[in-house]
């Protein structure tokens, strides 16, 4: 029994499903626009096994900090396969990254000032730069990322990347957070309008992330609108570029930066029911596990109860709650069905923003396991006290 060896709470990683998702998404876009690739969003789930698989499958690493950049390098990703986005960058690490051949998408004019110094200090090195672009897509949000394409600052950076001898202008990039399909044609058309207006077709066009992934029907039903599939995203975006570029001699590489779309259904969380009580007519089961382990709030996650041999009872509108001392730490509201102490609960669709956003709150985090056939691979050991507190002075 896995619990006997690894404890009463752990994550289960599915590396095979991750590879299937990556290839399916990539090939769906390529069927419409062949010169296409994926830059995997490390922030969504930076488990090294996933990152290594992306590199093995020919994808890029999309990082937003020097920490994530270091993850990519330790996973064996070459600098020229790393795309560094993000609003704030450590200037020393950025210099090392650019001199080594990495690609930086510049987010603001202050970052450009830093880059000018780097380029001057390294005249014999080619500095690879992209520009993060911000324009209207009709989603009701004024995005905080990138340059307003109608601003003076945008003109300044465009002039710089075109006129500086040792700077190689790589790409335009954008990122808009809303995942609904109706906003995807607008981000693609906005980019096409930009390159058409400027008369510049870069060697790469990067239209960012913000895609729904695969999920159980019970989870889909809790969203107000339709959950698009890979084909719908591809038709909404890749078709725009295929049509615009069909008569052009240059066919730039098209990139998206998905996270949830490829990793969302590739991790489960397993917890154990420890107590069941009735408080003023409401049944409450406390689990070794927390909402902070699954990072899904406001919805009931896809959940399965596995009887572990103890006595079960039938319950109605029972809440499964976490081990923390927070009233709102509820994993599942109003469960109807059988449940017993020491039963296992398995929560699906935990791949996105779960492991990476679990704080060192109340308890250290649990191990991550990959079950490959009959073999159990430890992807991340369970944390212990010293993992969290060795940086404190006692």
Predicted features along the sequence, with ranges:
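Charged (often Lys/Glu-rich) extended helix/loop segments that serve as interaction or gating elements
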Residues: 236-238, 242-245, 249-394
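A charged N-terminal "starter" segment
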Residues: 3-127, 155, 159-168, 196-201, ...
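Residue-level marker for buried hydrophobic side chains located in beta-strands
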Residues: 61-62, 129, 205, 254
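Conserved, mostly hydrophobic/aromatic
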Residues: 18, 43, 65, 97, ...
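Histidine-centered active-site/metal-ligand motif
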Residues: 85, 173-175, 304
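Active-site-proximal loop/turn and secondary-structure-junction residues that shape catalytic pockets
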Residues: 44-46, 67-68, 88-90, 108-110, ...
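Short acidic, glycine/serine/threonine-rich loops at helix termini
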Residues: 51, 74, 94-98, 115-118, ...
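Active-site loop/helix belt of alpha/beta enzymes
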Residues: 135-272
